[in-house]
A protein has these predicted regions:
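Active-site loop/oxyanion-hole signature of alpha/beta-hydrolase fold enzymes
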Residues: 71-111
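Conserved alpha/beta-hydrolase "nucleophile elbow" surrounding the catalytic nucleophile
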Residues: 49, 108, 112-114, 214
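Flexible "cap/lid" loop of the alpha/beta hydrolase fold
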Residues: 118-126, 132-164
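Conserved HGGG/HGGXW glycine-rich cap/lid loop of the alpha/beta-hydrolase fold
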Residues: 30-79
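Active-site nucleophile elbow and catalytic-triad environment of alpha/beta-hydrolase enzymes
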Residues: 184-201
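Catalytic active-site module of serine/aspartate enzymes centered on a nucleophile-bearing elbow/loop
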Residues: 241-271
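Conserved loop-alpha-helix segment in the C-terminal half of the alpha/beta-hydrolase fold
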Residues: 213-243, 249, 256
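Short beta-strand/loop motif that positions the catalytic acidic residue
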Residues: 205, 211-213
Length: 271
C-alpha cells in the first residue's frame, strides 16, 4: 500500500522544483518569452542559435537552489517573436538588456552557449558594469572562414535528422520559423561587423569570465578561446578534451565537473 504522506511530500517537492513563472515581455517591438525559476541573486541563461530556453531544463534544479534564473528565448527562437526576421548578436544583446530593465534587474551573472555567449560578449562591452561574472561556452569573438563555410552550407533540406527533430520540438512556428532561422544562420556568413571583437576591444571587458571550449569544435578552433583568454583581463580557460561544438548537458560525462567548476567560479573562489 502506498504511503499517502510520502506521496504528498514527493508531489510537493516536484511542484516546488518545477515551479516557474513563464511570461512575455514587450522589448524592441518584439515579444520576448522568458521563464523565471528559483530565488536569490539573478543568473541569466542564454541558449544557442536554433535552440530555445529548453536547452537549460536539465540544469534548472541545480542552479535554482542558489539563484533566481532568468531564461529567455532569443529573438524569433522558441516562443519569442521577431517581426524584422533579422538577427545579430548585437541586437540580441540589446533585447536581453531590455528584458532585464523591465524586470528591474541591474547586476547579474550569466551563462551563454554559442550565440548566447556571443550575445553576452556584446553585453559585456556595451555596459562593463552590469555583468558580475559570465561563462562563455563554445563561443567566439569572430567567425573564421572555416565557420563561414559551414554557415553558408546549411539549409532546411540538408539539416540532419537529429538537428531537425530538435528544432521542431523547440519552435512552435514549425517549418516557417525554422526556415527563417536557417536563413539568418546563412546570413551570418556574410556579416563582418557583428562578431568582430579585436583584442583591445576584448580587453575592455571588466566582468570575470570563464571560457569553456571543446578542443574539437568545428565552428571555432581552439586558438580563438585561447586568444580571448589572453585578452580578457580577468578570465579563466577550461579546454574540454574530445569535445566538439556543444553545450554540457546533464547526460555529459563532464556534467558533474561543469557544475563544480561553475559554482566555484561564481562564488569568487578563484579571484
Amino acid at each position: 500500500m502506498k504511503n499517502p504522506i510520502l506521496t504528498l511530500f514527493v508531489l510537493l517537492l516536484y511542484t516546488q522544483i518545477n515551479a516557474q513563472e513563464a511570461k512575455y515581455a514587450d522589448v524592441n517591438g518584439m515579444k520576448i518569452y522568458y521563464e523565471i525559476h528559483g530565488e536569490g541573486e539573478p543568473l541569466v541563461l542564454l541558449h544557442g542559435f536554433t535552440m530555445s530556453h529548453t536547452m537549460w531544463e536539465g540544469w534548472i534544479e541545480d542552479f535554482s537552489k542558489s539563484y533566481k534564473l532568468i531564461i529567455p528565448d532569443l529573438r524569433e527562437h522558441g516562443n519569442s517573436t521577431n517581426p524584422s526576421n533579422e538577427f545579430t548578436h548585437e541586437e540580441s544583446a540589446k533585447d536581453i538588456y531590455g528584458l532585464l530593465d523591465l524586470l528591474k534587474i541591474d547586476k547579474f551573472k550569466a551563462i551563454g552557449f554559442s550565440s548566447g555567449g556571443m550575445t553576452l560578449t556584446h553585453m559585456a562591452t556595451m555596459d562593463t558594469s552590469r555583468i558580475q561574472a559570465m561563462v562563455l561556452i563554445s563561443s567566439t569573438s569572430f567567425f573564421p572562414e572555416s565557420c563561414r563555410e559551414i554557415l553558408r552550407s546549411v539549409n532546411y533540406e540538408s539539416v540532419d535528422e537529429n538537428w531537425m527533430n530538435n528544432m521542431k520540438k523547440q519552435h512552435p512556428g514549425g517549418e516557417k520559423q525554422i526556415r527563417s532561422l536557417l536563413t539568418q544562420f546563412n546570413n551570418m556568413a556574410y556579416s563582418y561587423d557583428d562578431m568582430n571583437f579585436t583584442n583591445p576591444y576584448l580587453s575592455t571587458i571588466k566582468s570575470p569570465t570563464l571560457i569553456i571550449h571543446g578542443d574539437r569544435d568545428v565552428f571555432f578552433p581552439v586558438d580563438i578561446p585561447v586568444n580571448s583568454y589572453k585578452s580578457i583581463p580577468t578570465s579563466y580557460l577550461w579546454i574540454v578534451p574530445n569535445f566538439g561544438h556543444s553545450s554540457i548537458d546533464k547526460n555529459s560525462i563532464w556534467a558533474d565537473a561543469f557544475l563544480i567548476v561553475v559554482n566555484k567560479f561564481f562564488s569568487g573562489e578563484w579571484q
